[in-house]
């Protein structure tokens, strides 16, 4: 994610593992729990990750001081991320910072213990953030072919995490055809609970509407757009204003007149004949067969 050089975002890496932090590309790296773990990992124990974060509360507060918005991202199920993420998010929210969690759930083949840890961590993190976007790794298997290797699958998970963050921050930080400010984003993300993300890419004459259809039907959403009360949309690429209007109207028709839809659009001359659309849904009315995966 650091390599993508996302505009307006400062990265902070947090880990108990001293050796792992040496490979961290974030300009700021914080080792937590040195007294507790002696510079080693958390041993896949979330309680160790939690105590490690509590050991370095002042360092964590200093790292996020002055931020308007904090994203807490990690892969749930292990020790450090699962245990420390709710602590870090709680600090940010207590400081009055708009706090968004973007996390992955492990593949089911990683075992019951790791999945149970992830479920518990997600529940705790949900109480500590304004909005929580959960990306189930199992659903990524529907987006790749059978020949995809494990490293490639994990890279895909990282790409979705990156797109979730960038899809939000670019709306604020990059001037475009339709601009949003921080207050707009805050409206649809402050105290909203669980959210879902869909991403669509398309080319051709109908690229905008095609990308939107792919995004709103993405398996990552684990739900349908009908009944969503808040919808945040980022349309980026080689796109015209009429194409933006067509795609936005399609979403409005699906979500209904009562949905609060906020969207921004940026033109990228380097994205020749390609459009990428990120859709984030929150406060979804649950009805059969819609379900939330937690």
Question: Where is each model-derived feature located?
Answer:
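Nucleotide/phosphate-binding catalytic cleft detector across ATP-hydrolyzing
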Residues: 294
């Amino acid at each position: 994610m650091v390599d993508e050089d996302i505009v307006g975002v400062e990265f902070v890496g947090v880990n108990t593992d001293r050796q792992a932090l040496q490979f961290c590309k974030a300009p700021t790296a914080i080792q937590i729990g040195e007294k507790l773990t002696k510079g080693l990992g958390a041993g896949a124990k979330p309680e160790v990750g939690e105590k490690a974060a509590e050991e370095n509360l002042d360092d964590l507060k200093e790292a996020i001081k002055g931020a308007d918005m904090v994203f807490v991202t990690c892969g749930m199920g292990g020790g450090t991320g699962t245990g420390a993420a709710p602590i870090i998010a709680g600090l940010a929210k207590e400081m009055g910072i708009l706090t968004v969690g973007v996390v992955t759930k492990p593949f089911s083949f990683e075992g019951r213990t790791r999945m149970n840890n992830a479920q518990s961590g997600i529940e705790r993190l949900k109480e500590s953030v304004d909005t929580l976007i959960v990306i189930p790794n199992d659903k990524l298997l529907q987006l790749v072919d059978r020949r995809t290797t494990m490293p490639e699958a994990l890279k895909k998970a990282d790409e979705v995490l990156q797109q979730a963050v960038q899809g939000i921050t670019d709306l604020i930080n990059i001037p475009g055809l339709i601009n949003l400010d921080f207050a707009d984003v805050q409206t649809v993300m402050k105290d909203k609970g669980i959210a879902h993300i869909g991403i669509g890419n398309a080319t051709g004459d109908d690229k905008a509407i095609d990308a939107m259809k792919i995004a709103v039907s993405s398996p990552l959403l684990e739900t349908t757009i009908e009944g969503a009360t808040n919808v945040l949309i980022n349309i980026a690429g080689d796109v015209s204003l009429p194409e933006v209007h067509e795609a936005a109207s399609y979403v409005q028709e699906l979500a209904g007149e009562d949905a609060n839809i906020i969207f921004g659009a940026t033109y990228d001359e380097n994205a020749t004949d390609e459009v990428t659309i990120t859709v984030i849904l929150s406060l979804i009315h649950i009805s059969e067969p819609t379900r939330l995966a937690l």
